[in-house]
């Protein structure tokens, strides 16, 4: 991902304030509610029948935290996202058969959740930098599909 020094500083500073459990659970939950076809990858998670069920689901929250912990690894290695996400790309491609478009959708949902959590602190400049990061992560996760 090609970030300016200011962009890198902005995303890193904000990421240091992120509660991965809270934001991760909300981001994955919103993905499953807003794009319900993504639920097919989580049929072992139990009740996903209503938005309230999804947002209150302990397995969704736990997996959302796991997703954001992996994203944190990417934030620590912004210059090597393909390497950082190589094993996860392989897992999602070869074993889980996840549509790589879902990575882009989740990235966009994550940006919405960050805006919701950080309000005025999530300026248009910070959003632009995060859009670059989530696009880079989505590309890295889709790498094994090509």
Swiss-Prot record:
S-nitrosocysteine modified-residue sites: 93
Sites bearing N6-acetyllysine, chain numbering: 59, 82, 144
Keywords, in A-Z order: Acetylation, Heme, Iron, Metal-binding, Oxygen transport, Phosphoprotein, S-nitrosylation, Transport
Residues the record lists as Phosphothreonine modifications: 12
Phosphoserine: residues bearing it: 44
Gene Ontology terms, MF aspect: haptoglobin binding; heme binding; hemoglobin alpha binding; metal ion binding; organic acid binding; oxygen binding; oxygen carrier activity; peroxidase activity
Positions that bind heme b: 63, 92
Gene Ontology annotations for the cellular component aspect, listed alphabetically: blood microparticle; haptoglobin-hemoglobin complex; hemoglobin complex
UniProt tissue specificity: Red blood cells.
Domain of life: Eukaryota
Ranges where the Globin domain occurs: 2-146
SUPFAM superfamilies associated with the record: Globin-like
A single BP term in Gene Ontology: hydrogen peroxide catabolic process
Residue numbers carrying N-acetylvaline: 1
Pfam families registered for this protein in UniProt: Globin
CDD domains referenced in this protein's UniProt entry, alphabetically: Hb-beta-like
InterPro entries: Globin, Globin-like_sf, Globin/Proto, Hemoglobin_b, Hemoglobin_oxygen_transport
Family from the record: Belongs to the globin family.
PANTHER family: HEMOGLOBIN FAMILY MEMBER, HEMOGLOBIN SUBUNIT BETA
Subunit composition and interactions: Heterotetramer of two alpha chains and two beta chains.
Job description of the protein: Involved in oxygen transport from the lung to the various peripheral tissues.
Name by which UniProt lists this protein: Hemoglobin subunit beta
């Amino acid at each position: 991902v090609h970030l300016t020094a200011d962009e890198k500083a902005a995303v890193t500073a904000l990421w240091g304030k992120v509660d991965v459990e809270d934001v991760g659970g909300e981001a994955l939950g919103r993905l499953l509610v807003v794009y319900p076809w993504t639920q097919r990858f989580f049929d072992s998670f139990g009740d996903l029948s209503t938005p309230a069920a999804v947002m209150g689901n302990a397995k969704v929250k736990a997996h959302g935290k796991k997703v954001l912990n992996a994203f944190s690894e990417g934030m620590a290695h912004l210059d090597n996202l393909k390497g950082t996400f190589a094993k996860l790309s392989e897992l999602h491609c070869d074993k889980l058969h996840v549509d790589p478009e879902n990575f882009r959708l989740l990235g966009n949902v994550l940006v919405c959740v960050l805006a919701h959590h950080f309000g005025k602190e999530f300026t248009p400049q910070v959003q632009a930098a995060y859009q670059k990061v989530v696009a880079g992560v989505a590309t890295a996760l889709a790498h094994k599909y090509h």
